[in-house]
């Protein structure tokens, strides 16, 4: 809520919660007087945060953005990774121009799971999971790495023609936010969102 004030004290891997100058104990019924957090003492000075009512969002370039939410009592706090319906993707390593992509399903529809295979190049890595494949009008959210030449995903937009997609006409994108490329280092609320 907007009437209660807390002091959150971050130290190496822990967050202590004070209300009206009193340390809150037995956080989440754990017997601990702290909430475990992933940030080391050195990383604490690098976190950026924003807060709205009972929700605090924390960013650090080495971690998935975290959401800390106060529950129904002064000692009920949860921390979770932020989940995003949409996030940026980017083609970091365009090494498949000489390849040809083919779809394992004939005419897959929006929502279908399909497998895409590349011949003539081996561009697929585990870093592509969560990214996008685009070509011949179709868009697939990559959900699984199968091999260096194959991945599976969910069709978001149907292909005009999925028989053969030239590497030059395709885009194989990784999530822009990842352990390999880093995570957002800044955060804010805009219009209460």
Could you tell me what each predicted segment is?
Residues 1-3, 39-52, 177-192:
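Structural signature of eukaryotic scaffold interfaces centered on beta-propeller domains
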Residues 7, 15, 56, 65, ...:
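Hydrophobic residues embedded in beta-strands of well-ordered beta-sheets
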Residues 6-29:
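Beta-propeller domains
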Residues 24-34, 70, 77-173:
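Autoprocessing Asn-cyclization modules and mimics
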Residues 4-10, 54-59, 193:
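Short beta-strand elements that form the blades of beta-propeller/WD-repeat-like
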Residues 18-20, 68-71:
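Hydrophobic/aromatic beta-strand positions that recur at structurally equivalent sites within the blades
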């Amino acid at each position: 809520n907007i009437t209660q004030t807390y002091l959150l004290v971050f130290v190496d891997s822990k967050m202590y919660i004070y209300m009206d100058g009193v340390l809150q104990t037995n956080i989440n019924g754990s017997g601990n007087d702290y909430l475990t957090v992933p940030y080391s003492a050195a990383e604490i000075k690098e976190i950026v945060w924003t807060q709205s009512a009972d929700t605090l969002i924390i960013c650090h370039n080495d971690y998935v953005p975290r959401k800390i939410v106060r529950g129904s009592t002064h000692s009920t706090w949860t921390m979770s990774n932020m989940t995003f319906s949409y996030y940026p993707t980017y083609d970091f390593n365009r090494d498949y121009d000489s390849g040809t992509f083919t779809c394992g399903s004939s005419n897959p529809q929006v929502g279908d799971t399909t497998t895409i295979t590349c011949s003539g190049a081996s561009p697929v890595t585990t870093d592509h999971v969560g990214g996008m494949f685009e070509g011949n009008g179709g868009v697939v959210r990559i959900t699984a790495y199968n091999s260096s030449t194959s991945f599976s995903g969910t069709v978001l937009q149907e292909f005009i023609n999925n028989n053969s997609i030239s590497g030059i006409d395709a885009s194989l994108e990784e999530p822009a936010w990842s352990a390999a490329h880093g995570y957002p280092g800044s955060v804010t609320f805009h219009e209460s969102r």
